[in-house]
Regions:
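N-terminal nicking endonuclease/strand-transfer module with a His-rich metal-binding environment
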Residues: 1-197
Length: 198
């Protein structure tokens, strides 16, 4: 018998809306984290409902990113625009049919298969207040890293070419070009893939 699809919400942490990846990580983990960006300590007491919090790294990520403050301060440092997108946030409910003892293995398997294996860092926390709404928060990095653990650009400039393979010059003297994402993680199709996989 199929399990009904539980709550699954995806949002982007945006600096333009006054949001912070460090604050998001502090909220879900219950840790006290200092934000180098705004020089403020972020703390939201979630100890009563926190079951487990963990950071899962791809093999090429710097080991230091297993520290929550180091990771999210590094993310905020590389995103230097006022309107930067800092992280992807997913909040998902555990199906009521799943025993509590399976929550950790279930969320780790989901994060590994859907995110970490693709190069994202996944910072997750399982919350359970005992009110019948056990759920997990996942913060994901938006930038890929090279094999040395250096953040890569989110997009690159690509010059448009004519039928002869030559760059097209505009009347302004500039070359016609467009931006291409360096990873396809923002493609809308993944929202459905992730929901279906959960």
């Amino acid at each position: 018998m199929p399990i009904p699809c539980p709550h699954f919400k995806i949002t982007i942490v945006k600096r333009s809306q006054g949001q912070s990846a460090v604050a998001g990580a502090a909220y879900q983990s219950g840790e006290r984290l200092f934000s180098e960006y705004d020089q403020k300590t972020k703390f939201y007491n979630k100890k009563k409902e926190l079951v487990h919090a963990e950071i899962m790294l791809p093999s090429h990520a710097p080991p230091g990113y297993a520290d929550r403050a180091t990771l999210w301060n590094a993310v905020e440092a590389v995103e230097n625009q006022w309107n930067s997108q800092l992280a992807r946030r997913i909040v998902l409910a555990f199906p009521v049919e799943v025993p509590k003892k399976q929550y950790l293995s279930m969320i780790k398997e989901f994060c590994q298969e859907q995110f970490v294996s693709k190069g994202m860092i996944a910072d997750f926390a399982i919350h359970d207040k005992g009110d019948g709404n056990p759920h997990a928060h996942i913060l994901l990095t938006l930038r890929a890293m090279d094999e040395h653990g250096k953040w890569l650009p989110k997009a690159r400039k690509v010059y448009d070419l004519d039928e002869n393979g030559e760059r097209i010059q505009l009347p302004s003297g500039n070359w016609k070009c467009h931006k291409e994402n360096t990873v396809d993680w923002n493609d809308q199709k993944y929202a459905e893939v992730w929901r279906h996989s959960w």
